[in-house]
């Protein structure tokens, strides 16, 4: 799990309505307490850590299983690109950054391959939430 404590899904993976329009949600939104530590659910290498307009502060971790884990809307980042991380290591803290954010939560996504250009996978299944 990418953070400790109670996990509640506020927006599941897949098609949804967003601001009156149909939108494909490429991850799962998990509500939490502002500034809660976000941790890596698997060992891997940080391939991206920075800021993007929609997702705000974000991190991508490439795992030995050939999947990229995507963490979005974080308040602060604790790792940099090129660092190796271990399961349970702090990546940053939960926040509400970016233009596609409606309150403190973590958007968590899973992609096949390195980076976000591969097939998007169901993050809820990855986290055993369904």
Would you name each region that the model predicts?
Residues 31, 80-89, 109-130:
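Acidic, glycine-rich catalytic/binding loops that coordinate metals and/or anionic ligands
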Residues 30, 58-61, 86-100:
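Short hydrophobic beta/alpha edge segments that flank linear recognition/processing sites
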Residues 36, 65-68, 117-119:
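Short acidic/polar mixed-charge low-complexity motifs
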Residues 1-57, 87, 121:
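Surface-exposed, glycine-biased beta-strand/turn segments
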Residues 35-36, 51-52, 96-99, 113-115:
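Short polar/acidic secondary-structure junctions
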Residues 23-26, 40-78, 99, 103-109:
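Zn2+-dependent peptidoglycan hydrolase active-site motif and core
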């Amino acid at each position: 799990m990418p953070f400790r404590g109670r996990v509640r899904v506020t927006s599941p993976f897949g098609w949804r309505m967003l601001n009156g329009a149909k939108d494909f949600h490429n991850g799962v939104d998990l509500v939490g307490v502002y500034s809660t530590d976000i941790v890596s659910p698997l060992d891997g290498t940080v391939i991206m850590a920075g800021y993007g307009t929609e997702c705000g502060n974000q991190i991508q971790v490439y795992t030995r299983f050939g999947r990229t884990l995507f963490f979005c809307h974080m308040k602060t980042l604790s790792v940099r690109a090129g660092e190796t991380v271990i399961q349970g290591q702090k990546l940053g803290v939960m926040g509400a950054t970016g233009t596609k954010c409606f309150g403190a939560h973590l958007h968590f996504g899973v992609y096949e391959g390195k980076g976000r250009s591969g097939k998007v996978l169901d993050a809820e299944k990855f986290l055993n939430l369904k």
